[in-house]
Amino acid sequence: TTESPSLLRHSEVETLFHEFGHILHQTLTRAPFSRFSGTAVERDFVEAPSQMLEHWAWDSDVLASFTRHKDTGEPLPQALLDQMTKAKNIGSGIHYLRQIYFASLDLAYHGTNSITDSDRLARELHEITSFEFPENTHFQAGFGHLFGYDAGYYGYLWSQVFGDDMFTRFEKEDPIDVGRDYRKFILEPGGSKDAETQIVDFLGREPNNQAFIEEIGLDISSD
């Protein structure tokens, strides 16, 4: 408005970083054919670069470089970021159950069995969430990823495992050097190489889910 600027929630900042991850993937490609350029990779890898970049939306130095209080001009206080980080995984169990439900429903709708009652299938699979099914809402009619992203919604979770694992290199090594490798091994090839090969080339090892498990706040250590 004329009296107040447009402000971003932190979740919207995360989304900005996420989409910028796709932009980098698309603009820095050096694939020899357009068919395999940029984000033209396997559907269950395409979200890995974008979700990896979301980690920077939680980095104190990055946030301090551009966040400002609309009245005082002060950057985001470290104490506030610390509290945000502590609260990051509140409700994460519900979030991931919801994601698993959406992915399962997407795969079921686009599976080999003929579907004549979309509500019935949505109701049956809703047990995954442990919540009561909201009758007469027909939420699937507004589930945009069912169209154009068909049978690929599971790729968000699958890609997050890769994205979290790739970020571990940035945490452990000089981010400038790692960034060069990231550009060379992940962004430049596009779909001209198998995603699994790209990940191994970048990490120097087979990927695993340890970083993902830690990122979502699970403790799977044995007593």
Feature map (PLM): residue ranges:
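C-terminal, non-catalytic "cap/extension" segments appended to globular domains
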Residues: 16-19, 23-32, 38-47, 52-59, ...
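Short pre-active-site segment immediately N-terminal to the catalytic Zn-binding motif
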Residues: 1-17
